């Protein structure tokens, strides 16, 4: 090297070093500061592999998306189509979210997916697709095409996907003709399939054997073909409610092979009997709103693990549940019989039953032993039946020592039942014909927190002295819509909410609430109060009071 060239090289090196250390030019020598991350306009890129363009009202696919993107969010925009060139170059995508756009099938090029050979999560729900993509990548794990207008699926839409676990197709327009027999061929680990709210007329054949959750509610299904559910031994939840199933559309083997089934919903169909072949693993059986008139014990004898049996709104009459029908159900926790035509409590209730819910029936009597077998009952609802005090045995409730909630609203009771258990927390007796309250009727209820006596015929003079004495835990007392002329005296000290609306109260004296220092809410609307009917001293000691309702009285009341 010639001396002149060497001198020039040394001068250049010196200049470079000087400017590298110059604080005025930190970007020239500071390698710790990364170059600006490429990101589409208005979008955010919180990480090198994430591009978030959600909710920007975009009408065209954004440009300048880095090839390094693994997660692309475009949901909640106005996109109608995806350009093949832009999408196909993003070959490293793992997640593509197109939820809630205006994308049509014509605007979603099948060819683009051939390049997305690492795509795992594909969300295109709430768009305008009329057919599914003919091909989706083999790498797919989750596919959500719900809430479109899809009428046809293709063999390679969901077939040959060894990693696919969840498919969502609910709220489309699928008929059975739009599902090829090999829809899920080669996809052997699918655990969740949602086909609800379509137009299927029978249960599709060749469903994946790996299924754990199958949603078929809100279709037109009238039949489950024989063997359609013979391989789904992992199925835990099956939803068939709101269809058109009849007894002839099921047979003894329909559910018998489902050896893992825990939840079966057949409500809102046209079944006249309980289905045969129920598996022993079943925990919840929902048969509400069918046409069932009779329950045969043999139909339940294998379902020994059943904990919740829901039979509300059927046509169960006086002999619908003969003695012994429920005996095999030793684990039964809850029995729903709401809205039938039962005239008595079912005999021989399971001993571990904790909730018996049967309002809106025709029950007219309660005998001494009607509930004796269900000593574990914690909730008993017999509201809106035809119970009269004369036909409720004094010992009907006496042995229910775990009972916490008793609802007898809407019956024909003229007095409180005798023998109420001390364990009660809630007692509902509204809309009866109660005329008297005596201390003996509420004796021992020192755990009661809520007492509803609304819509009866109670007068203050018919409430015996000391009636409230033992209700030491009472927080809520509803005496609305009775015939009270003033606030009942000596109310429970723990009381926090007092409902006295729609009575005949015309005056509230200074001593009215001396016994209730913890009162938080007081309702006196629609009485006979005038401007100065409430003495100022009446409310002075109520430091916790937050609500005083005196509307709809003859005059505006000063409080």
Curated annotation (Swiss-Prot):
PANTHER family: AGAP008170-PA, PODOCAN-LIKE PROTEIN 1
Entry-listed glycosylation sites: 64
LRR repeats (start-end): 66-89, 90-115, 117-139, 140-160, 161-186, 188-208, 209-231, 233-257, 258-281, 283-302, 303-328, 329-352, 354-373, 374-399, 400-423, 425-444, 445-470, 471-494, 496-515, 517-541
Signal peptide start and end residues: 1-20
Pfam families per UniProt: LRR_1, LRR_8
GO cellular component: collagen-containing extracellular matrix; extracellular region
Keywords: Extracellular matrix, Glycoprotein, Leucine-rich repeat, Repeat, Secreted, Signal
Localization per record: Secreted, Extracellular space, Extracellular matrix
Keyword Glycoprotein: yes
Gene3D superfamilies, per the entry: Ribonuclease Inhibitor
Highest taxon above the source species: Eukaryota
Record-linked SMART domains: LRR_BAC, LRR_SD22, LRR_TYP
Assigned protein family: Belongs to the small leucine-rich proteoglycan (SLRP) family. SLRP class V subfamily.
UniProt xrefs under InterPro entries: Leu-rich_rpt (IPR001611), Leu-rich_rpt_typical-subtyp (IPR003591), LRR_dom_sf (IPR032675), SLRP (IPR050333)
Name of protein: Podocan-like protein 1
Expression by tissue: Detected in bone where it is expressed in osteoblasts and newly formed bone matrix (at protein level). Also expressed weakly in osteoclasts (at protein level). Expressed strongly in calvaria, lung and femur, and weakly in kidney.
PROSITE patterns: LRR
Processing and modification events after translation: N-glycosylated.
